[in-house]
Regions:
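A polyanion-binding, active-site-adjacent surface
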Residues: 1-244
């Protein structure tokens, strides 16, 4: 099992990879990669849709009006931003805040899955349709399943998945805000259940049986230890890689 320091260093490496990503055309119009922010050891993680204009300028998720509402809702359950980790399905802003395209979600999925594996939250709150459909692997919309916690295996980990309306959808619709607030109030009781059982790790392949000696065969002469196989070079350290 990785230590907290090891997980943070790996998370920084994924961040550096994302900063240089050119896997889809969104890199041509972004100002900043919006990787995610918060507590890298959080039990609770929020996953939204994509950065907006404010997020693209600042490089941080949920810093506009939807972010202020998210902070207010967290405060109502005795939490703050520093207690959780917040990310999006996309790390770059789609032009005009349009909906993400499927190929963009596919190109960015690696970064989100790496975050989920390294942060290892107990509970993930998906915010809105795109995050919910992506992590559930199901086309059912948020209006039908919001506020219904379930246990899901995502990548190598099993988590408590809790679909919620996106705060942006609740800004100007009182009925949606009421539903979002009611669902939010259940977060502490779901977190209190603790982490779900994790899947068994895959069994190691069996060791191959030693080869039987062939009668009458000439004995094999071992190759010189240094001539044929050179020593591998030393890996670069974090400073050389530009990690912080």
């Amino acid at each position: 099992m990785r230590t907290a320091i090891e997980r943070r260093e790996l998370l920084k490496a994924v961040y550096e990879e994302a900063r240089g990503c050119v896997a889809c055309p969104l890199h041509e119009t972004r100002t900043n990669v919006v990787f995610g922010a918060g507590n890298a050891d959080a039990d609770l993680m929020f996953v939204g849709e994509a950065p907006g204009a404010n997020e693209d300028q600042q490089g941080l998720p949920f810093v506009g009006q939807a972010g202020k509402l998210l902070e207010k809702l967290l405060g109502e359950i005795g939490m703050e931003r520093g207690d959780v980790f917040i990310a999006n399905t996309l790390k770059c802003r789609p032009p005009g805040n349009r909906d993400p395209y499927p190929h963009e979600l596919d190109a960015c999925r690696h970064y989100l899955e790496s975050q989920l594996e390294l942060i290892a939250p107990t509970m993930i709150c998906t915010l809105g349709n795109f995050a919910t459909k992506l992590l559930r692997g199901d086309p059912i919309g948020i209006s039908k399943i919001h506020g219904q916690p379930e246990v899901r295996t995502i990548g190598p980990r099993t988590v408590r998945l809790y679909p919620l309306y996106h705060p942006a959808a609740a800004l100007y619709t009182p009925s949606t805000l009421e539903m979002l607030r009611g669902d939010f109030l259940r977060i502490p009781e779901i977190l209190a259940l603790g982490p779900p059982d994790q899947p068994e790790p895959p069994a190691a392949p069996p060791e191959p049986a030693p080869a039987e000696p062939v009668l009458g065969a000439e004995p094999t002469v071992a190759a010189p230890p240094y001539d044929a196989i050179p020593e591998p070079p030393e890996p670069p350290d974090a400073e050389q890689l530009g990690l912080f």
